[in-house]
């Protein structure tokens, strides 16, 4: 597969992570980055039965490779598309076996950048829908914003994968917008998007997941009640 070159990056220089030359950026033009050119078919990790990567008990697949390179990304060790190990039929069969368990709600796609690994993920998601229908949900994180994915000229495989995804957490991680009270996100620019509802009107702003409940909405009032009752006083 072709190696990434300077031409794979736009000339702007916004929110670069470490080790990114000043001529490179994490703001790609429409269609500039593609799975066909960049993915090496590698995965970094597969984790079973987690409750941190979306709603309910989930299995999580971490694909390798991400050119967004966000500042203080917690997964910078797998920015390289060659990191990790090859995705195999054996791993796919294990994922399907785990998803068949009645207490597992669904699969989460992370990375790395899932939408630049569609060669792996499209067949997997198609198999999930074929064998489980909509009884198992699919979540995904992406560095792309919804608006970037909907713009004219973006590679069609990204939209094809989106059609199998139920919930998308979109946008780069922005260090200056970090908020530890956000649900399933690291920075306040990111959104939890209901993909099927949003695709009904792709030219409109995306529909936010109806179960969103950021902790910052509730903690101040709870803290105030605790203070009024004397809980937490040093005395």
Question: What feature does the model see in each segment?
Answer:
Residues 119-129, 178-227:
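P-loop/Walker A phosphate-binding loop and immediately adjacent motor/lid segment at beta-alpha junctions
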Residues 64-67, 71-74:
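Cys/His/Pro-rich metal-binding microdomains
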Residues 166:
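Receiver (REC) domain switch/active-site residues of two-component response regulators
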């Amino acid at each position: 597969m072709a190696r990434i070159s300077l031409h794979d990056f736009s000339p702007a220089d916004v929110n670069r992570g470490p080790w990114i030359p000043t001529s490179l950026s994490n703001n790609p033009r429409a269609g500039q980055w593609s799975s066909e050119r960049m993915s090496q078919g590698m995965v970094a990790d597969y984790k079973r039965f987690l409750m941190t990567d979306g709603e309910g008990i989930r299995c999580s697949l971490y694909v390798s490779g991400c050119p967004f390179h966000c500042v203080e990304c917690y997964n910078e060790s797998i920015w390289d598309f060659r990191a990790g190990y090859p995705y195999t039929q054996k791993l796919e069969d294990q994922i399907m076996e785990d998803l068949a368990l009645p207490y597992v709600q669904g699969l989460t796609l992370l990375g790395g950048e899932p939408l630049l690994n569609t060669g792996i993920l499209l067949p997997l998601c198609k198999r999930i829908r074929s064998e489980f229908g909509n009884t198992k949900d699919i979540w995904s994180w992406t560095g792309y914003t919804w608006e970037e994915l909907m713009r004219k000229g973006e590679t069609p495989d990204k939209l094809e994968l989106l059609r199998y995804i139920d919930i998308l957490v979109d946008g780069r991680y922005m260090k200056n917008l970090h908020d530890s009270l956000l649900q399933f996100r690291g920075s306040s620019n990111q959104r939890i998007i209901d993909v099927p509802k949003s695709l009904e009107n792709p030219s409109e702003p995306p529909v936010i997941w109806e179960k969103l409940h950021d902790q910052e909405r509730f903690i101040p009032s709870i803290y105030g009640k605790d203070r009024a009752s004397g809980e937490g006083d040093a005395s």
